[in-house]
Amino acid sequence: MMRTQCLLGLRTFVAFAAKLWSFFIYLLRRQIRTVIQYQTVRYDILPLSPVSRNRLAQVKRKILVLDLDETLIHSHHDGVLRPTVRPGTPPDFILKVVIDKHPVRFFVHKRPHVDFFLEVVSQWYELVVFTASMEIYGSAVADKLDNSRSILKRRYYRQHCTLELGSYIKDLSVVHSDLSSIVILDNSPGAYRSHPDNAIPIKSWFSDPSDTALLNLLPMLDALRFTADVRSVLSRNLHQHRLW
């Protein structure tokens, strides 16, 4: 009897210790994500020289088209048996939407440095969201990323895409007729197959907290706004190079 009680007590202690350890790991991961997301990031925006100001005045203000899923954020929803993020990783925000009369919760994770990225590029470009997701979901995500800054006002959704061979194609002429001034940032090459010379490829992001792809793009986007035609740069076999 004594032995049985000892075994039960040991099992209870082990179970409690396991739960305590899991909770500790959860808190640690959350803290690491917070530190990485909000660590001091430097990309100094220096005053333009007279020559640079003159050059920028001679070209049109460019449009930067931004994809959402796996480019700026990653999400999974209720009922996903194998979520693509590590168990216990807290989402940055949770969305509750109704799809086909059924409430669905989306757990959304922001790509590292996305807030800083949007703050910087919004000073250089007119920003446009173009996602193959449904509007009820994409609009809610864009609202969260915009965070009342009014930098993501123009938005296009699945109904603005063309479905070809099971893939959603994004026609940039829907955004603007002058393709010389449009850049699209998207993790899916199929999405911009009609406009490869306007695209900047970026690797898909799911959960890596050390990802710096958005930061790596800032120097290029800074320089690209001075061109008369973005295709003169982006057509140079960029898609054969390493992804950002």
Curated annotation (Swiss-Prot):
Record's CDD domains?
A: HAD_FCP1-like (cd07521)
Q: Name one GO cellular component term.
A: endoplasmic reticulum membrane
GO: which molecular function terms? Answer: phosphoprotein phosphatase activity; protein serine/threonine phosphatase activity
Q: Which Pfam families match?
A: NIF (PF03031)
One GO-annotated biological process of the protein: positive regulation of triglyceride biosynthetic process
Q: Which family does it belong to?
A: Belongs to the dullard family.
The identity of this protein, by name, is CTD nuclear envelope phosphatase 1
- State the organism named in the record: Homo sapiens
Q: What is the lineage of its organism?
A: Eukaryota, Metazoa, Chordata, Craniata, Vertebrata
